[in-house]
Regions:
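Active-site core segments that coordinate phosphate-bearing ligands/cofactors
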Residues: 5-6, 18, 110-122, 136-148, ...
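Glycine-rich beta-strand-to-loop/alpha-helix junction loops that act as flexible
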Residues: 76-81, 206-207, 253-256, 386-394
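Short beta-strand-loop/turn "lid" adjacent to the catalytic site in phosphate-handling enzymes
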Residues: 65-97, 125-129, 158-179, 202-205
Length: 434
């Protein structure tokens, strides 16, 4: 039996998951987990990449303890963020997407290239933290003067494990710098913004064999294996992990909720732009989807209002509430507030009981999902009948029920580590086991 290691890192935790083929299906076992999160340093929200790398290596070592022979590993993470490099040296810090540094850069970028033109060329939604705005901020503050490379988070981790540099396609589609038609970097945009063209080489595709662990890392983890490219953007891997048809929708429900469909070609028309849809790369298809604030809202309310309670207890409180107020969870105020409760209070104009906050949040999320389904059907001129939900949110029966009621679609919850399954699936395809 062959074993594969998926390293799936999200904004709040990282997981090392062993996968293998049994009875015609992919079986998985978590062998290591660690906490993740941005830290505040010098007034900015940043990622502690040294700590993340330490945990990645520690998890590989734990995997080898239990499974001495592993065929390969692959890494998927969140998108948009990156590490600037000068030769072999990192240019710190590694800013996190919730940092506010790009607030003053967005209009400056749009003065150079109007957003309508950006969207038509890239098909990439507006998010204030998209890589395009982060790199422009780096340029404005002189951080690109010594940079000769930038590596997205999974690419940086692969580099530290193997010594090899790759630039993977699916994650690059989150940058706002790729041309939707060509699938490569749009050098017209890059030149107009004055970004160094040398930072943007040809992209690598999933299923590429990168190579083995470096001698130093192999010695530290007591083993060696191949490193391959999966869809390194975690949502790309999550969608790969769902067995679905073309007339079905997916919802990757975690810190963010990403609701969309698989298309042969992207859509960058005015309706898509006005409703902030994005076209992200999949393996042989485009993921036409919308980013919704997601379980971040629930987690922040829990942290503030009742950290001692379990999520089951929170759901019970929400079910017992009769409050019917709703909020637009996609408002910028929800992105990185000092108090999530205060955001609700300010929007609703009243203070609520604890259970009411959660009922409002869950119903607002479900309502946003339903509205998004309607928009997708309108924009793609197709009707969809099933909605597959994967990720941590798939375990929330209350939110799933609300989503089914409000959307009118059959909800199929798959409480699996879908990103890890998709990650492992690609590794198996590289080994010709699938």
């Amino acid at each position: 039996m062959k074993y594969y290691l998926a390293i799936d890192i999200g904004a709040s935790s990282g997981r090392h998951i062993i996968g293998y083929l049994k009875n015609g299906g992919i079986q998985s076992e978590e062998v290591y987990r660690f906490r993740n999160g941005m830290i505040r340093k010098d007034g900015h929200l940043v990622w502690d990449m040294q700590h993340i790398l330490y945990e990645v290596i520690r998890g590989i070592k734990e995997a080898f303890k239990k499974y001495p022979v592993i065929e390969s590993l692959s890494i998927d993470t969140w998108g948009v963020d990156y590490v600037l490099m000068h030769g072999e040296k990192e240019i710190w810090p590694c800013f996190g997407y919730r940092d506010e540094r790009t607030d003053d850069d967005i209009n400056e970028v749009w003065k150079i290239i109007p957003f309508t033109e950006l969207y038509t060329r890239t098909g990439c939604q507006f998010q204030k933290f998209n890589t395009i705005y982060q790199l422009y901020d780096d340029k404005q503050h002189g951080r690109l003067e010594e940079a000769d490379d930038f590596l997205m988070i999974p690419e940086y981790l692969i580099y530290k494990l193997t010594g090899q540099r790759v630039r993977e396609y699916t994650n690059a589609t989150t940058t706002g710098l790729l041309n939707l038609e060509t699938g490569g970097y749009d050098h017209y945009i890059i030149e107009k913004l004055g970004l160094p063209s040398g930072l943007f080489p040809k992209l690598d595709q999933p299923k590429m064999n990168v190579g083995c662990l470096s001698e130093e890392v192999a010695k530290e983890v007591n083993g060696n294996l191949n490193v391959v490219l999966c869809a390194t953007h975690d949502t790309g891997s999550a969608v790969e992990g769902i067995e679905m048809e073309d007339d079905e929708l997916y919802l990757s429900s975690g810190t963010w909720s990403l609701l969309g469909v698989k298309l042969k070609e992207g859509i960058a028309d005015n309706d898509s732009m006005m409703n902030n849809y994005t076209n992200e790369g999949g393996i042989g298809y485009i993921r036409y989807q919308k980013n919704i604030m997601g379980m971040w809202v629930i987690n922040e309310l829990k942290k503030e209002l009742c950290p001692e309670k379990s999520f089951d207890e929170i759901v019970k409180m929400a079910e017992q509430s009769s409050y019917n107020g709703l909020v637009d969870v996609n408002l910028p105020a929800f992105l990185s507030p000092s108090s999530m409760k205060k955001v609700f209070d300010d929007i609703l104009g009243e203070h609520l009981e604890t259970g009411d906050y959660f009922r409002c949040a869950y119903r607002s999320l479900a309502g946003c999902y339903a509205k998004t389904v309607e928009e997708i059907e309108h924009n793609t001129k197709r009707e969809y009948h099933k909605l597959y939900i994967v990720g941590g949110g798939a375990k929330n029966h209350y939110l799933n029920r609300l989503t089914e009621e409000m959307s009118g679609k059959k909800v199929i919850a798959l409480p699996i580590e879908s990103s890890a399954i998709g990650n492992i699936k690609v590794q198996m395809e590289v080994e010709y086991e699938l």
